[in-house]
Amino acid sequence: MGLISSATFGLIPLLSIPVLAQGVAEGTVLMYRFLIAALIVGSIVVIRRESLRVSWRSFLILLALSVLYFFSSFLLIEGYQHMPSGVATVLHFSYPTFVVLLMFIAFRQRINLLQGLAVLLALGGVSLISGFFESDVTAIPFRPLLTVLFSGFCYATYIVILRHSRLEPMSSFKLTTYVMGLSTILFALFCKATGSSLVLDNTTQWIYTALLALIPTVCANITLVWAVQRIGSTPTAIMGALEPLTAVVVGALALGEELSLGQGVGIGIVLCAVLLLVMSPLLTRRLKKV
């Protein structure tokens, strides 16, 4: 389920960039994305005859999760305006590193030697992806770079809170309904504050937005919650390796995006860092037996 979640998340550029290219504001696209998703998942909750009632404490936790999801999704889609979507997605994919660091800071979960090496590799890969060692023509501006990295940090915080908060037990459908519904309200308020139009002008925009809501939102979030609740936050983040791969392939084949040699190497290094994180528990146990 974690792999399915990551692969479907990787389709966000394919379904959002064509709408953005027609002049629709980022906040408007995301508002409709989450509105349609909330209606779909909410209908499932009703069919399952599951109560939507939650305690005030759980509601506040859900609101916090929604705020994190608001920033994560908005900052990522904002990054698409300043760099290839595949690069933006790989930078966002720094979130497994943030998960490991947050688990260490908040819960004193040890970072072993292999995990530390993976974190350093990830940082090196991000440096290459940003164009730090290349000419100014190919380098990614510092502010957009920080923007997308912060989207990854917000997403990592979302994963950790989802796993370790005192949120009352609930199905992934109910949780997703709340997060998507509250995110819709946040984006509606954001559009109102920024003066963005709330209108989608044509059928093409509606089709892309509906698919954006269904595939990388409904399917991806339900499988993400399912994975986090059953296997934990760190393994779920690590299995997200398929997300940047999907985005890079989609960007190259469907959107005509090009990568520099350094960025390609950087992507490979980040993925190696993730694989090292995946293998670190097994390798650590084997090394202890030697």
Question: How should each PLM-predicted stretch be described?
Answer:
Residues 8, 13, 45-92, 128, ...:
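Specific transmembrane alpha-helical segments of multi-pass solute transporters/efflux pumps
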Residues 21-71, 98-99, 153-161, 176-195, ...:
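Transmembrane alpha-helices of multi-pass small-molecule transport proteins
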